[in-house]
């Protein structure tokens, strides 16, 4: 009888451990404002314009023990661009650049995750921007995970990437304005 009880306990513990090791699904916390897609681009080679996209959301699957099994899917509303200057925002949103009337969304879907360190990874995926889909790599950092004060469970990440705007059919205003640096930061709330 004791052997059966110990075997059942061992099996239960193994199943529980296996269940905890499975990837969990998360929703990016847009409502709590714990999600940012910021960018920086050269202005005529003299300074930088900084901006953000205010309206985006997404989901991801993550298991810290198997980061290579992670997946992320993000959609961004291009008209939510904000650079703290209304006329510039209007110009960047126009046909000259993003053409948000014709291309109202940008989308990123991961295709592979490769660990590069204890808490870092290269996230490769397809970015659709301005009607063009190209592979990009996001240098990602896992910031941590745990219970939050509201009874949920969260995981947080940062990521950076550099885009060549010509690759997406977007012409910068000059030779120094062809690359855009992305800085992404978000928390995800685990789905129940």
Swiss-Prot record:
GO annotation, cellular component aspect: periplasmic space
A Pfam short name: YceI
Species this chain originates from: Pseudomonas savastanoi pv. phaseolicola (strain 1448A / Race 6) (Pseudomonas syringae pv. phaseolicola (strain 1448A / Race 6))
Xref: SMART domains: YceI
SUPFAM superfamilies, sorted: YceI-like
Signal peptide start-end: 1-23
Domain of life: Bacteria
Family from the record: Belongs to the UPF0312 family. Type 1 subfamily.
Compartments reported by the entry: Periplasm
Keywords: Periplasm, Signal
The protein's name in its UniProt record: UPF0312 protein PSPPH_0448
HAMAP family xrefs: UPF0312
InterPro entries: Lipid/polyisoprenoid-bd_YceI (IPR007372), TTHA0802/YceI-like_sf (IPR036761), UPF0312/YceI (IPR023480)
């Amino acid at each position: 009888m004791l052997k059966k009880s110990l075997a059942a306990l061992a099996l239960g513990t193994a199943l529980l451990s296996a269940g905890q090791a499975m990837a969990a699904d998360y929703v990016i916390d847009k409502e709590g404002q714990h999600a940012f897609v910021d960018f920086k681009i050269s202005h005529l080679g003299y300074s930088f314009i900084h901006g953000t996209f205010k309206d985006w959301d997404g989901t991801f699957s993550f298991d810290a023990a198997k980061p290579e099994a992670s997946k992320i899917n993000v959609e961004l509303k291009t008209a939510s661009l904000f650079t703290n200057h209304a006329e510039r925002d209007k110009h960047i949103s126009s046909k000259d650049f993003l053409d948000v009337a014709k291309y109202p969304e940008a989308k990123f879907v991961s295709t592979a995750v490769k660990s590069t360190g204890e808490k870092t990874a290269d996230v490769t995926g397809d970015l659709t921007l301005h009607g063009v889909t190209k592979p990009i790599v996001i240098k990602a950092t896992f910031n941590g995970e745990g219970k939050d004060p509201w009874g949920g469970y969260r995981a947080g990440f940062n990521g950076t990437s550099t885009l060549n705007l010509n690759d997406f059919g977007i012409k910068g205003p000059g030779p120094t304005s062809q690359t855009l640096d992305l800085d992404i930061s978000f928390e995800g709330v685990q789905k129940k």
